[in-house]
């Protein structure tokens, strides 16, 4: 059975997470792992660590409605705090830094 449109969570070996969505084509593709910034991820690991690298993928939400998936992705990024650079790799919904 194939998933429709989904929001997923990737967990990297260092425990940091990325929340993403797959709303393409006919639905979720098992080999789709999002559009996270690989330079941000790579800087957290040594070359040796990157040579044996496992990412866990969990489906958090599924819907037939792309707009609902878009909304849920934003909600889950905030809920899981994956937009906090200490916790995750999401670049959207980042808190604004206060300037003095």
Per-region residue spans from a language model:
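Structure-specific nucleic-acid interaction/processing domains
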Residues: 1-100
């Amino acid at each position: 059975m194939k998933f429709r449109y989904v929001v997923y969570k990737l967990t990297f070996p260092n425990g940091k997470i990325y929340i993403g969505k797959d709303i393409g084509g006919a639905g979720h593709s098992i080999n789709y792992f999002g559009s996270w910034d690989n330079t941000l991820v790579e800087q957290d690991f040594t070359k040796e660590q990157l040579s044996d690298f496992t990412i866990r993928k969990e489906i958090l939400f599924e819907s037939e409605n792309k707009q609902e998936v878009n909304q849920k992705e934003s909600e889950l990024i905030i809920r899981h705090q994956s937009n906090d650079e200490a916790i995750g790799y999401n670049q959207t919904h980042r808190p604004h830094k206060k300037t003095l």
